[in-house]
Amino acid sequence: MIRYLTSGESHGPALSAIVEGVPAGVGITPEMINTELARRQQGYGRGGRMKIETDQAEVLSGIRFGKTIGSPITLIIRNRDWENWTTTMSQFSEPAEDIAKITIPRPGHADLTGKIKYGLNDIRPVIERSSARETTARVAAGTISRIFLKAIGIEIGSYISAIGSAGETTADTQIEKLLRSGAETLARKADRSAVRMLDKKKEAEAIIAIDAAKDAGDTLGGIIEIFITGVPMGLGSYMQHDRRLDANLAAALISIQAIKGVEIGTAFANALKPGSQVHDEFIIEPEKGLTRSSNRAGGIEGSMSSGQTIHLRAAMKPISSLLTPLHSFDSETLQPTLSRFERSDTCAVPAAGVVAEAMVSTVIANAVLEKFGGDHLGEIQTRISLHRDLTRKAFIA
């Protein structure tokens, strides 16, 4: 099983991750990881921090001569902004007299609950660790799983279907055409858009909406569409709750900062229809074997992969740090006041799509390892190839 821990504060010296359980023999270069880190930094509506940081991963262990060796992989991404925060975020010195404590929580953020939970007299430590800056380390770690999956024929991609009231109208036929070449083809097309949308008209509407929100001191959320192609039938299990593929994918997405909802396939539309209009009927064709009439289940049935493309949707709330402050209070004096502003983005939905790709990568990689086992890439590739052949032949008359 692949697992990882991240560490580091938003304005500390660095972010880090230790990734354990990666099979040996997976070819990895720093450029592969840094490409994904650069994708996470893109998107119209990002804040001033992106002008400071150019995220680059340093690999300290677990790779030799460009291939994984089975041992834990240690990754570090240094924060360039640290030099401006050495006093405020000092690890061992006494706090300077001119450092003001943050005592006014922002509605919608971790500020108040984190302060109370950890017995803090200053909200700053809560801000530092709960910040979405932490997802830099998650993207670096998840890219390791993503590269492993690509080596066994599984691809992951995303695009943004809505930002604020600017909704996507991309035809399903266009998406299906892109997915035939693999989910990364769809992601590359989305990356050519400033907001990672596929529809140029809606892209323009989204940019206008972001500009309007920025001018008003407001923020915008949106909807992320995630696709996973090349998934073999039978990943996950209905035997126990913690082996259910849909549950693990949903948990991974909900763990991303500001993600408040997850949908698998067309789940919410399905809930309003009779079963006869929902379930994906089986079709046996002489040469192609088993196909389906549709994919409303999103590639998962009975908590297992059906062999179809997995389709997930994630809803991201608007960022909770607003230039136009909301009503709050001072947690020391209990006096009503307006919320404070912490440097932030107007819209980070495009970046969240890249984080979502990284998060589901590790879930799918673990489902593969659970089903097929193996400590070296070569033996896993052999087992999956055999499984694909047997599955295909089983449905050809």
Swiss-Prot record:
One of its GO terms (cellular component) is cytosol. One of its GO terms (molecular function) is chorismate synthase activity. Signal peptide: none annotated. GO terms for biological process: amino acid biosynthetic process; aromatic amino acid family biosynthetic process; chorismate biosynthetic process. FMN binds at R129, S130, S131, Q257, A258, G302, K317, P318, I319, S320, S321, R343. Its cofactor is FMNH2. The keyword Ubl conjugation does not apply. NADP(+) binds at R40, R46. It catalyses: 5-O-(1-carboxyvinyl)-3-phosphoshikimate = chorismate + phosphate. Pathway: Metabolic intermediate biosynthesis; chorismate biosynthesis; chorismate from D-erythrose 4-phosphate and phosphoenolpyruvate: step 7/7. Its EC number is 4.2.3.5. Reduced FMN (FMNH(2)). Pfam families: Chorismate_synt (PF01264). The keyword Cytoplasm does not apply. Keywords: Amino-acid biosynthesis, Aromatic amino acid biosynthesis, FAD, Flavoprotein, FMN, Lyase, NADP. Homotetramer. Belongs to the chorismate synthase family. This reaction introduces a second double bond into the aromatic ring system. PANTHER family: CHORISMATE SYNTHASE. This is Chorismate synthase.
